[in-house]
């Protein structure tokens, strides 16, 4: 995943309604009509949000007659997560002797150092 893709996903997830849509889809595939029942938005507004989520491949859709069903693209979320997991705290890159006794405050297993 490149920086442009990550930026696009962050922008897509920067909207409260789209985050709520993702949280509903965590439980499995949903019809657009089911999503509409949970929100106070119009069908065109839902379509707009779903297009943004689909364009960055966070959700996938399928048609069944006149109905559209959406589900999370788990592989895309895994790639997104791995991008952030690959970011290493600069303190972890230093040797223990170079840290002057400071532990990283952002990583598991390290104590939180307050300045």
Positions of the model-derived regions?
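Base-recognition residues in the alpha-helical recognition helix of bacterial helix-turn-helix
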Residues: 23, 47-49, 66
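Alpha-helical residues within the helix-turn-helix
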Residues: 37, 48, 54-55
């Amino acid at each position: 995943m490149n920086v442009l893709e990550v930026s696009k996903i962050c922008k897509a997830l920067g909207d409260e309604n789209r985050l709520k849509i993702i949280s509903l889809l965590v439980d499995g595939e949903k019809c657009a009509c089911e999503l509409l029942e949970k929100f106070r938005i119009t069908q065109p507004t839902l379509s707009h949000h779903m297009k943004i989520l689909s364009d960055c491949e966070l959700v996938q859709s399928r048609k069944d007659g006149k109905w559209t069903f959406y589900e999370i693209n788990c592989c895309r979320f895994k790639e997104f997560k791995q991008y952030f997991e690959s970011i290493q705290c600069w303190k972890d890159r230093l040797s223990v002797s170079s840290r002057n006794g400071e532990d990283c405050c952002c990583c598991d297993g390290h104590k939180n150092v307050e300045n």
